[in-house]
Amino acid sequence: MAMVSEFLKQAWFMDNQEQECIKSSKGGSSVQSRPNFDPSADVSALDKAITVKGVDEATIIDILTKRTNAQRQQIKAAYQQAKGKSLEEDLKKVLKSHLEDVVVALLKTPAQFDAEELRASMKGLGTDRR
């Protein structure tokens, strides 16, 4: 997604007179690294949220949306090591619909997400010659 977003920004800037104004504005990620980040504590909280009766979606959302992508990757690895199974697969089993899609997307690296979105967007493109 980041690559596509950057491409669209560059394409838009070609004919835009406000380019300098926009370039000077502060940007970047709104999610900051947590100084006291502990992946094993997050793994425990996520495991509890997944296994509790009724699934604690609020805890899952709270943890995954308040961590940087690098921290989410550490959580994934720590979960795999501690539980011997994939965090993504466990979340897919208990979550449904759009929430499942968003949570699974949050667990991907930016490159994985971009590649899968580009592949999905091009699926079915081409001609059907007869």
UniProtKB/Swiss-Prot annotation:
- From the UniProt record, list the Annexin repeat ranges: 37-108, 109-130
Q: Which sequence positions carry the modification called Phosphoserine?
A: 24
Recorded hits in Pfam families, A to Z, give:
Annexin (PF00191)
Cross-link Isoglutamyl lysine isopeptide (Gln-Lys) (interchain with K-?), where in sequence: 19
Where does the chain bind Ca(2+) 5?
130
Q: Where does Ca(2+) 3 bind?
A: 122, 124, 126
Residues bound to Ca(2+) 4 are: 127
This entry carries the following GO cellular component terms, namely: apical plasma membrane; basolateral plasma membrane; cytoplasm; early endosome membrane; extracellular exosome; extracellular space; lateral plasma membrane; motile cilium
Q: Does the keyword Cytoplasm apply?
A: yes
> Under the GO molecular function aspect, what terms does this record hold?
calcium ion binding; calcium-dependent phospholipid binding; phospholipase A2 inhibitor activity
List the SUPFAM superfamilies hit by this protein, alphabetically.
Annexin
What does the UniProt entry say about where the protein is found? Nucleus; Cytoplasm; Cell projection, Cilium; Basolateral cell membrane
How does the UniProt record describe the way this protein sits in the membrane? Peripheral membrane protein
Q: Which SMART domains match?
A: ANX (SM00335)
The alphabetical list of record keywords is:
Adaptive immunity, Annexin, Calcium, Calcium/phospholipid-binding, Cell membrane, Cell projection, Cilium, Cytoplasm, Cytoplasmic vesicle, Endosome, Immunity, Inflammatory response, Innate immunity, Isopeptide bond, Membrane, Metal-binding, Nucleus, Phospholipase A2 inhibitor, Phosphoprotein, Repeat, Secreted
What are the binding positions for Ca(2+) 2 in this chain?
92, 95, 100
Q: What is known of its domains?
A: The full-length protein can bind eight Ca(2+) ions via the annexin repeats. Calcium binding causes a major conformation change that modifies dimer contacts and leads to surface exposure of the N-terminal phosphorylation sites; in the absence of Ca(2+), these sites are buried in the interior of the protein core. The N-terminal region becomes disordered in response to calcium-binding.
What is the annotated role of this protein in its UniProt record? Plays important roles in the innate immune response as effector of glucocorticoid-mediated responses and regulator of the inflammatory process. Has anti-inflammatory activity. Plays a role in glucocorticoid-mediated down-regulation of the early phase of the inflammatory response. Promotes resolution of inflammation and wound healing. Functions at least in part by activating the formyl peptide receptors and downstream signaling cascades. Promotes chemotaxis of granulocytes and monocytes via activation of the formyl peptide receptors.
Q: What else is known?
A: Was originally identified as calcium and phospholipid binding protein that displays Ca(2+)-dependent binding to phospholipid membranes and can promote membrane aggregation in vitro. Was initially identified as inhibitor of phospholipase A2 activity (in vitro). Inhibition of phospholipase activity is mediated via its phospholipid binding activity that limits the access of phospholipase to its substrates.
Family, according to the entry, reads as follows:
Belongs to the annexin family.
Q: State the protein's name.
A: Annexin A1
Species the sequence originates in:
Gallus gallus (Chicken)
